[in-house]
């Protein structure tokens, strides 16, 4: 928790100035809101330059500025392509060298074919001039055809080694980058995370590392092969006749100029796209992790629009990126075709001049054709390399950052025997993320060894800052913290944190079992290496001490129960007790309790507090508490106000002083009307408690009878109910099994995303067809050129004339290709980025449409869904944009080329076409294998990404437990598992890819052998032969290129199926459904009629067992009872987060399941136990309470005044325009809660639901806010869940829950007189002076 110092007593003139300033700025247009949203996120994610930081911190003294800069500065890493391989091992580099050589050798195979071609051309001329016999000709032809076969076999082996090798090394290196990035993240100081959203970490560790992997894997091999082909071709050309080769080499210069000029813009656009997606990922992570809040307030539309702000920015830069690549590719094709024309023109002059012969010219021209064509294959890969460099820059900037407070460092001393005396000496503290606010000023405090020191005071006064400084989450700007007289800066940080156990206000559990969560408390302690049996005993003992053992054993799987992501499957109190058990299991020297019992009910709190009191003995304990009943026995109570110590002493001393502490006590004092209880009465009450546990529960006020008339029948009913509900829930789960979709269905589904671009997409298809037809046309020109150069010396005049004509035709073809390729690139850039934008936007909206049960499923964790949004949408573009255009283009090339070949020489064409089905079969089989591989790989990476996201979003808990090494071991284990699984799939798919590429040589061998025979017999002339061979070469190559897109298509198919499943999933409780009655007005009668409920993820665990409850209009009722008894579940059912298994919830006599869910929820407002704020300004967060934008400032101000937050907001430099940070990280818990209350009040609800609404507030704020809530409750039906009983003593009826039933009800006074369960709870919270 990051606290901000408040100034509640702002003078009137200061407030009026703020009011005059703020409304104008806060009444913003949509574009202004987008700017604020962008600002809020960009502030959180951009690398801060030293100049930026100096400007932000200019008002501070130099030494303070330096301390804050160390905690904030993020270096702006300049990545080059070489830096992507920085984590390659020696073995990786050796392997890379081998596979690079294989790629280069594979690339040299095609130019070697031109040597054979030139030789055969000479042989053809010889037989035409009758210089050799037909048998000699046939022998030479057969031998050269066999050379083609040998070349094909060699290329198959070389390509296979290259593809498998590069994919393996790429995955291996990327695996290390993922691990290094997470390792670097876990070593950062907490100030770094105040600037960084957990969603950005997920985006970096999934989408960005995938981009790096894409840029260093098989695309490197393909590029090396293409470059090798290019250079080999030109080397052969220079050897044959250097003058012509030199002239044709101008191609290289032109291409380098084009690529160099455009790639600068490509890299910048790629970087900006990644930044925008990172910011969007942070918003998505915030929203999904707080989905209950978004659902309760119906803010899905507003939050989706906030997400779209960043998607639009990413779309803008993405379009620029794709357009530049399209223009670059078009320019390169134009240069290539122009070069053909230049070659023919100059070649004809050299031939006529007698400087060279036909064989050399044919060899050189064909080498130039192949070499120039191959360079075209490099262009599509440059985008992958550029994206990899951009992604690398973002990732390496974090990896290279030297943390100011590094938990992974071995530096620093240790103290052999820690006594535990803590001293804060002259402390001044400023949070790095909010440098304009001083949180602590001149704090001097000694915490004696073995004593308990309590810190109390208003929210934001600096209490939790004490914990942050002692744990070294932050460094103070001046002063020092000492442990046993040693400045903690000189101590080893990991060792220091292992001496301290922390239980924080919002308990964080990890997505594993209860046993493993408690075991985490043993990290770094001597007990960590004990036997499993001893560890088990310690864990059970700690759970018993924390009053957690009984509820754990009540769970079906006991200690082996998985708690879900962040412990969502447990109630707040249950999570808190497990966190306490985790803290005390290692018997620490220093215990920090930051609101450690805030989430517990009074009964649990009493037991746990006794356990904590016992655990505190003999160790140094610092307790931060708002609930003063928990700290009255402390050895020293320190009252902190405004970042300074106001007073300190024992409970009695401070009460006698009649100062600030007494005011806090009075604010929280419960008005009990009872006499002193004798010791005998206490014994009697204990006996009553025991008898109550085995007898019939107390009468329910509303039912008029005992809920369970017969105990045996009741037990039987529960058993039956369990079976029935388990069947119902298992049926619901089975209905959600993965649906399989046909390829056609998925293609239609993806095409739907580009529906608005249909017309321009048709234009794109038109240009793609024109581009594709270019190569077969070039084949005609090429054959005509060869035929022209074959003319005898007597026709040299005609030769020069024809050569000029065909050279000009090549130039014209180049210009046409420039236009068509560039136009195609621009059009598909628009379509592709629009598809990605809509896919992300609609899938995010589809997620927000789902009911809460969807998010409870383990596979739908925040990390998994955020990763899905960032990664799978990118995969979806594998069948759109540049990929789709290229596939259509090469398909056209294949069809037109084969058609032309059939038209001019059907015999030779048919023989060559017979090989095409084999190529298609290889390609499609590879496509199918990759689709299967992608499905498996995606799940593995989702799992590891989800785990990384969970760890980073709980960084304070990870840091305080020194769990960094454990997190890394699990994460690296997940990555290793995925690498092993992928290798076999890669081996299969690469086999087929190599086959599909090398088959073109076998096709050429067959074509030359059969076509040469036809030529030798005189059936075909030179034009027919060269045309058919040229068409088949490029046609079959085009088929191979189509299948090089198989990985992208495989990913797209898998992603499309996931999207279709998400879009097709219609939730049971559907916010988009128009069905159900809409309520215009509501009186506010709420009824529960025999409600039974179990959570869908835990069908064997009953939560509510026949609940009957009636709340009359305008009535204020309170729900109290032990943790896990069903109080918060009751609130969830009123909100209709879930539907009941049996029975019903009614409003004004109408079953809420038959009402329109949006209309119904519009009459409710919820304030939860853990407040949720989103990226953006304070004003934006308050306005999330209403579904319209035209809310006057006065209404916003009124809601904030009612929630006692207005004065604090106006004291901030930017007032209502203050950016709250990721998840409200810039504010303290109390400040966040009051903004959440303001958000509820601006809604003006008829039914107000308060789930621990004031649990995060100090006594002073609580009193004012409670009064505001009491006033707000007038005329409204209010249901309040409370552990702190002082907040609900004025309730009209208080219902005491136990095990899903009401066991007692009445007013505060009636229940006190009954001296039952409620009476005990009140007694435990008594704030009377200790005797």
UniProtKB/Swiss-Prot annotation:
It is found in: Cell membrane. The lineage of its organism: Eukaryota, Fungi, Dikarya, Ascomycota, Pezizomycotina. Its main location: membrane. Belongs to the ABC transporter superfamily. ABCB family. Multidrug resistance exporter (TC 3.A.1.201) subfamily. GO terms for biological process: oligopeptide export from mitochondrion. It is a multi-pass membrane protein. Pfam families: ABC_membrane (PF00664), ABC_tran (PF00005). Disruption phenotype: Leads to increased sensitivity to terbinafine, 4-nitroquinoline N-oxide, and ethidium bromide. Leads to a reduction in infecting activity, characterized by low growth on human nails. Impairs the MDR4 induction when the fungus is challenged with amphotericin B or terbinafine. This is ABC multidrug transporter MDR2. GO terms for molecular function: ABC-type oligopeptide transporter activity; ATP binding; ATP hydrolysis activity. Glycans are attached at residues 293, 529, 860, 1108. Keywords: ATP-binding, Cell membrane, Glycoprotein, Membrane, Nucleotide-binding, Repeat, Transmembrane, Transmembrane helix, Transport. Signal peptide: none annotated. It comes from Trichophyton interdigitale (strain MR816). PANTHER family: ATP-BINDING CASSETTE SUB-FAMILY B MEMBER 10, MITOCHONDRIAL, ATP-DEPENDENT PERMEASE MDL1, MITOCHONDRIAL. The gene is MDR2. Disulfide bonds: none annotated. The chain crosses the membrane at residues 93-113, 147-167, 219-239, 242-262, 325-345, 358-378, 762-782, 810-830, 884-904, 910-930, 995-1015, 1025-1045.
């Amino acid at each position: 928790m990051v606290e901000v110092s408040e100034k509640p007593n702002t003078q009137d003139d200061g407030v009026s100035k703020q009011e005059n300033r703020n409304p104008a700025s806060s009444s913003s247009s949509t574009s202004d809101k987008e700017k604020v949203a962008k600002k809020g996120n960009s502030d959180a994610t951009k690398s801060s330059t030293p100049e930026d930081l100096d400007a932000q911190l200019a008002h501070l003294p130099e030494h303070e500025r330096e301390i804050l800069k160390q905690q904030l500065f993020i270096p702006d890493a300049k990545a080059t392509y070489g830096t992507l391989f920085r984590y390659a091992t020696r073995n990786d580099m050796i392997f890379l060298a081998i596979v690079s050589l294989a790629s280069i050798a594979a690339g040299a195979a095609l130019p070697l074919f031109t040597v054979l071609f030139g030789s055969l051309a000479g042989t053809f001329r010889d037989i035409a001039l009758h210089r050799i016999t037909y048998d000699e000709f046939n022998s030479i032809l057969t031998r050269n055809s066999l050379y083609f076969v040998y070349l094909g076999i060699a290329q198959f082996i070389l390509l296979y080694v290259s593809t498998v090798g590069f994919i393996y090394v790429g995955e291996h290196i990327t695996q290390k980058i993922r691990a290094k990035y997470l390792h670097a993240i876990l070593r950062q100081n907490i100030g770094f995370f105040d600037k960084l959203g957990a969603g950005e970490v997920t985006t970096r560790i999934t989408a960005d590392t995938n981009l790096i992997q894409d840029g260093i894997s098989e695309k490197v091999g393909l590029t090396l092969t293409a470059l090798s082909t290019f250079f080999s071709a030109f080397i052969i050309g220079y050897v044959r006749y250097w003058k012509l080769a030199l002239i044709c080499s101008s191609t290289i210069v032109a291409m380098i100029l084009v690529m160099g000029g455009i790639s600068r813009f490509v890299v910048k656009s790629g970087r900006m796209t990644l930044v925008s997606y990172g910011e969007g990922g942070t918003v998505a992570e915030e929203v999904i992790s707080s989905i209950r809040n978004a659902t309760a307030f119906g803010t899905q539309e507003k939050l989706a629009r906030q997400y779209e702000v960043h998607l639009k920015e990413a779309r803008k830069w993405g379009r620029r990126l794709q357009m530049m690549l399209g223009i670059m590719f078009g320019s390169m094709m134009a240069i290539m075709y122009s070069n053909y024309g230049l070659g023919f023109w100059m070649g004809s002059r050299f031939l006529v001049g007698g400087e060279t012969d036909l064989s050399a010219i044919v060899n050189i021209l064909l080498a130039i054709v192949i070499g120039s064509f191959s360079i075209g294959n490099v262009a599509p890969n440059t985008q992958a390399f550029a994206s990899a460099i951009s992604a690398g820059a973002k990732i390496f900037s974090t990896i290279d950052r030297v943390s100011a407070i590094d938990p992974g460092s071995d530096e620093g001393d240790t103290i052999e025997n820690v006594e535990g005396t803590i001293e804060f000496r002259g402390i001044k503290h400023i949070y790095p993320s909010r440098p304009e606010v001083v949180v602590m000023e001149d704090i001097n405090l000694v915490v004696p060894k073995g004593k308990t020191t309590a810190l109390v005071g208003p929210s934001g006064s600096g209490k939790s800052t004490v914990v942050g400084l002692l744990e070294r989450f932050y460094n103070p700007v001046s002063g020092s913290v000492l442990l046993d007289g040693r400045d903690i800066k000189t101590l080893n940080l990991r060792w220091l944190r292992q001496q301290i156990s922390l239980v924080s206000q919002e308990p964080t559990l990890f997505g594993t079992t209860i046993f493993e969560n408690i075991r985490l408390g043993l990290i770094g302690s001597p007990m960590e290496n004990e036997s499993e049996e001893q560890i088990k005993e310690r864990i059970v003992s700690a759970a018993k001490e924390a009053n957690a053992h009984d509820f754990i054993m009540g769970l079906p799987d006991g200690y082996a129960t998985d708690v879900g992501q962040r412990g969502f499957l447990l109630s707040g109190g249950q999570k808190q007790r497990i966190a306490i058990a985790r803290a005390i299991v290692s018997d620490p020297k220093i215990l920090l309790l930051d609101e450690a019992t805030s989430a517990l009910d009074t009964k649990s709190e009493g037991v746990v507090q006794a356990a904590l009191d016992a655990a505190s003995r003999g160790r140094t304990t610092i307790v931060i508490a708002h609930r003063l009943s928990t700290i009255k026995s402390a050895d020293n109570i320190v009252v902190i106000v405004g970042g300074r110590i106001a007073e300190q002493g024992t409970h009695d001393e401070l009460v006698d002083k009649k100062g600030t502490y007494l005011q806090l006590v009075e604010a929280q004092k419960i008005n009990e009307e009872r006499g002193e209880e004798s010791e005998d009465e206490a014994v009697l009450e204990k006996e009553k408690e025991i008898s109550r546990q085995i007898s019939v529960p107390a009468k329910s006020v509303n039912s008029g009878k005992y809920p369970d008339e017969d105990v045996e029948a009741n037990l039987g009913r529960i058993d039956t109910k369990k079976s029935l509900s388990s069947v119902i829930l298992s049926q619901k789960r089975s209905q959600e099994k993965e649906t399989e979709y046909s390829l056609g269905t998925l293609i239609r589904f993806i095409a739907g995303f580009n529906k608005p671009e249909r017309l321009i997409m048709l234009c794109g298809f038109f240009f793609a067809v024109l581009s594709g037809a270019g190569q077969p046309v070039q084949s005609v020109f090429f054959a005509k050129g060869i035929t022209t150069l074959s003319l005898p010396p007597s026709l040299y005049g005609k030769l020069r004339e024809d050569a000029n004509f065909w050279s000009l035709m090549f130039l014209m073809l180049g210009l046409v290709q420039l236009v068509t390729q560039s136009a195609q690139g621009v059009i598909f850039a628009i379509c592709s980025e629009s598809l990605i934008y809509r896919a992300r936007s609609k899938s995010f909206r589809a997620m927000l449409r789902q009911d809460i049960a969807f998010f409870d499923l383990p596979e739908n964790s925040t990390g998994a869904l955020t990763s899905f949004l960032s990664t799978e949408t990118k995969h979806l573009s594998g069948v759109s944009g540049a990929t789709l255009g290229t596939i259509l283009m090469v398909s056209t090339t294949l069809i037109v080329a084969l058609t032309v070949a059939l038209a001019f020489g059907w015999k030779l064409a048919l023989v060559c076409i017979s090989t095409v089905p084999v190529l298609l079969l290889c390609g499609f089989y590879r496509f199918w294998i990759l689709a299967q591989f992608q499905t498996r790989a995606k799940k593995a990476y989702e799992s590891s990404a989800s785990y990384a996201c969970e760890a980073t979003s709980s960084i304070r808990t990870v840091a305080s437990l020194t769990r960094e090494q454990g997190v890394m071991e699990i994460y690296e284990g997940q990555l290793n598992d995925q690498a092993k699984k992928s290798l076999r799939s890669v081996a299969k798919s690469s086999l087929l890819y190599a086959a599909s590429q090398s088959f073109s040589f076998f096709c050429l061998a067959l074509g030359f052998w059969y076509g040469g025979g036809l030529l030798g017999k005189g059936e075909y002339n030179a034009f027919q032969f060269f045309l058919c061979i040229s068409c088949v070469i490029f046609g079959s190559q085009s088929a191979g290129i189509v299948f090089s897109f198989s990985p992208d298509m495989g990913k797209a198919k898998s992603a499309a199926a996931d999207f279709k499943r998400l879009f097709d999933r219609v939730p049971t409780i559907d916010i988009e459904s128009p069905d159900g009655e809409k309520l215009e007005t509501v009186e506010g009668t709420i009824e529960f009629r025999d409600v039974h409920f179990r959570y869908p993820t835990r069908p064997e665990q009953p939560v509510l067992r026949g609940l009957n409850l009636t709340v009359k209009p305008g009535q204020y009722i309170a729900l109290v009872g032990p943790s896990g008894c069903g109080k918060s579940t009751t609130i969830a059912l009123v909100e209709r987060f879930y539907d009941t298994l049996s029975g019903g919830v009614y409003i004004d006599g109408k079953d809420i399941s038959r009402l329109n869910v949006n209309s119904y929820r519009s009459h409710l407002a919820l304030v939860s136990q853990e407040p949720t704020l989103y990226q953006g300004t304070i004003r934006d967060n308050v306005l999330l309470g209403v579904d319209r934008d035209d809310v006057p400032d006065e209404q916003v101000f009124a809601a904030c005044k009612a929630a006692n937050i207005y004065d604090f907001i106006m004291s901030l430099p930017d007032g209502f325009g203050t950016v709250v940070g990721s998840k409200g990280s810039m504010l303290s818990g109390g400040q966040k809660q009051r903004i959440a209350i303001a958000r509820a009040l601006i809604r003006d609800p008829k039914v107000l639901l308060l789930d621990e609404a004031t649990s995060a507030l100090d006594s002073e704020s609580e009193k004012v806010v409670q009064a505001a809530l009491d006033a707000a409750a007038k005329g409204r039906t209010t249901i309040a869940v409370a552990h702190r009983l002082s907040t609900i003593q004025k309730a009209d009826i208080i219902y005491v829950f136990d095990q899903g039933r009401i066991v007692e009800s009445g007013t505060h006074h009636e229940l006190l007189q009954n001296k039952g369960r409620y009476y005990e709870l009140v007694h435990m919270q008594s704030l009377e002076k200790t005797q």
